[in-house]
Amino acid sequence: MKIHDFKNKKQEQKKISMLTCYDYPSACIIANSNIHCVLVGDSVAMAVHGHPTTIMATIEMMELHTQAVARGLGKQFLITDLPFLGHKSSQGHTVENVKRLLQAGAQAVKIEGADKDTCQTISHLVNAGIPVMGHIGLTPQSIHQLGGYKVQGKNSEQAETLLQQADALEQAGCFAVVIECVPQGLAKTITDSLVIPTIGIGAGPGTDGQVLVWHDMLGLQTSFNPKFVKKYFRAKDHFIEALNSYVQQVQQMHFPANEHSF
């Protein structure tokens, strides 16, 4: 998938599928699938490193995981999150951070928020030839400011703000925007108001595409079960079953068998 395919898919009313990925083996699996694009999300801090929020993601962490994913991917378009405060100090610092992610293998970066400074930074990056994906609604890097993981845009004032933010990101030059944890009616209204495609997570079926976290949709963990996640596989249960089978076969001396020995 190429950058121009995002807008083309919206025009053709073909839904976009995006999935997070954080490591080489997972990327190799995705490379053999029909997934359109991959996000090395700052959710890696939680899903892989065990932190309670995405705030703990660093540029070094994002760079390392981007390199690993890029080595395994095939035709999928690769986007990497700019981590917490990665674009807030200065434009020079932002450009340097983005440069590291692009050199690691990302084809675009995703930036959370749509305040005036963020939109100016996005415009600067786009003018420099760097594709940027926006992100509005529940923005996990601002979780303390938002007061927790809550649905955004539930009242008319918040809804109007999100509509304005989406427009501002489009005007800044974003090629797409993620809408997270927003009522489905509002997400559809935002989607219809934009030329660029929207990618929803917890935003209903009316967006131009969907994104889920690898570990969530495959059932690799069961302690986090948000309403918007559908588990397409029970990987954790199958993994535990395989581990226990291994232990049993070792104890019963069924492994290694002759075919596993020299």
Curated annotation (Swiss-Prot):
Amino-acid positions noted as binding Mg(2+) in the UniProt annotation, renumbered to this chain: 42, 81, 112
Protein name stated in the entry: 3-methyl-2-oxobutanoate hydroxymethyltransferase
PANTHER family to which the protein is assigned, alphabetical: 3-METHYL-2-OXOBUTANOATE HYDROXYMETHYLTRANSFERASE (PTHR20881:SF0)
CDD domains documented for this protein: KPHMT-like
Catalytic reactions on record: 3-methyl-2-oxobutanoate + (6R)-5,10-methylene-5,6,7,8-tetrahydrofolate + H2O = 2-dehydropantoate + (6S)-5,6,7,8-tetrahydrofolate
Any Pfam family: Pantoate_transf
Active-site annotation: 180 (proton acceptor)
Pathway note: Cofactor biosynthesis; (R)-pantothenate biosynthesis; (R)-pantoate from 3-methyl-2-oxobutanoate: step 1/2
GO terms of biological process kind: pantothenate biosynthetic process
EC numbers on record: 2.1.2.11
Database matches in InterPro entries: Pantoate_hydroxy_MeTrfase (IPR003700), Pyrv/PenolPyrv_kinase-like_dom (IPR015813), Pyrv_kinase-like_dom_sf (IPR040442)
Entry keyword annotation includes Amino-acid biosynthesis: no
Assembly mode: Homodecamer; pentamer of dimers.
Top EC group: transferase
Keyword Lyase listed: no
Binding, 3-methyl-2-oxobutanoate: 42-43, 81, 110
Keyword terms of this UniProt record: Cytoplasm, Magnesium, Metal-binding, Pantothenate biosynthesis, Transferase
Gene symbol of the encoding locus: panB
Gene Ontology CC terms: cytoplasm
